[in-house]
């Protein structure tokens, strides 16, 4: 198990993701020698469907790393309870811009975190990727999962503002402080991942090419990108009504 955790660290995964992998694998460590025991532990668990699917994904990654083909195949075929549709909190561009406008009486810390929050929304990058930005010939690159470098598009004015604080960013080891400021500036229901989800929702609903959004976010496949599209129930109903109740010309 330790060699797998070392592998996840080399892949440049976030600290929170690595901790999740560790926690899940420790939960299954006593039964990892038997597929039947693993299956029974999954099936008989009292976790919510979303947590069970998370466990499945972690175990799939672990089995793939260990080249346990039979375990991998059996787990892929294992039927799990369906995940209920869940509406996550996202923030609109206009609302985010209002909340991150820098005011004259803002402290230096508030100015810094308002800039970071706006940059995360405008780029859709993962919070920990902030520490791996590289500017080359007016192009911006980030080191993402699996140590894969990708080019990202950005708003020049926001990035120039961010550069004023960038040396301070280098000292962060976790995004815990960032989480606290996001809740303070935007609202208690928001997290760094909410900004990433908000970016995807905004871009896709405005008609952006899904592949462009996929590449910007560093996703390996388009299905993952579409899973970030999050419209609340009211928005879904408004879109449905607009389409269904419009008068089509014959």
From Swiss-Prot:
Q: Name one GO biological process term.
A: chromosome segregation
Catalytic residue positions: 126, 145, 193, 196, 219, 228
Q: Please give the name of this protein.
A: Tyrosine recombinase UU222
Enumerate the spans annotated as Tyr recombinase domain: 83-241
Q: What does this protein do?
A: Site-specific tyrosine recombinase, which acts by catalyzing the cutting and rejoining of the recombining DNA molecules.
- Record's PANTHER family? INTEGRASE_RECOMBINASE PROTEIN MJ0367-RELATED, PHAGE INTEGRASE-RELATED
Q: Which family does it belong to?
A: Belongs to the 'phage' integrase family.
Task: Tell me one GO molecular function of this protein.
Answer: DNA binding
Pfam families recorded: Phage_integrase
> Where is the organism placed in the taxonomic lineage, from the top?
Bacteria, Bacillati, Mycoplasmatota, Mycoplasmoidales, Mycoplasmoidaceae
Looking up InterPro entries in the UniProt record yields:
CB, DNA_brk_join_enz, Integrase-like_cat_sf, Integrase_catalytic, Tyrosine_recombinase_XerCD
Q: Tell me which residues make up the Core-binding (CB) domain.
A: 1-67
Q: Which organism is it from?
A: Ureaplasma parvum serovar 3 (strain ATCC 700970)
GO terms for CC? cytoplasm
Key words, A-Z:
Cell cycle, Cell division, Chromosome partition, Cytoplasm, DNA integration, DNA recombination, DNA-binding
Q: Where in the cell is it found?
A: Cytoplasm
Q: What Gene3D superfamilies does UniProt report for this protein, alphabetically?
A: Intergrase catalytic core (1.10.443.10)
């Amino acid at each position: 198990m330790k060699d797998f955790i070392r592998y996840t660290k080399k892949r440049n995964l976030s600290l929170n993701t690595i901790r999740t992998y560790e926690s899940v694998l420790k939960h299954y460590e006593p039964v990892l020698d038997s597929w039947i025991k693993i299956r029974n532990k999954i099936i008989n668990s009292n976790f919510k469907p979303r947590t069970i699917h998370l466990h499945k994904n972690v175990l799939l990654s672990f089995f793939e790393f260990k080249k346990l083909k039979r375990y991998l195949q059996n787990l892929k075929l294992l039927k799990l309870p369906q995940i209920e549709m869940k509406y996550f909190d996202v923030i609109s561009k206009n609302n985010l811009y209002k909340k991150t406008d820098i005011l004259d009486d803002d402290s230096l810390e508030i100015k810094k975190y308002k800039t970071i929050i706006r940059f995360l929304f405008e780029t859709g990058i993962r919070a920990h990727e902030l520490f791996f930005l590289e500017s080359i010939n007016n192009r911006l690159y980030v080191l993402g999962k699996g140590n894969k470098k990708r080019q990202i598009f950005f708003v020049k004015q926001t990035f120039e503002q961010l550069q004023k604080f960038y040396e301070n960013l280098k000292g962060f080891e976790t995004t815990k402080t960032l989480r606290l400021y996001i809740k303070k500036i935007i609202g208690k229901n928001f997290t760094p991942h909410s900004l990433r989800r908000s970016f995807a929702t905004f871009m896709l609903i405005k008609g952006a090419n899904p592949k462009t959004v996929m590449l910007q976010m560093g996703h390996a496949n388009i299905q993952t990108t579409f899973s970030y599209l999050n419209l609340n129930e009211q928005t879904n109903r408004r879109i449905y009504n607009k389409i269904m109740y419009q008068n089509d010309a014959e």
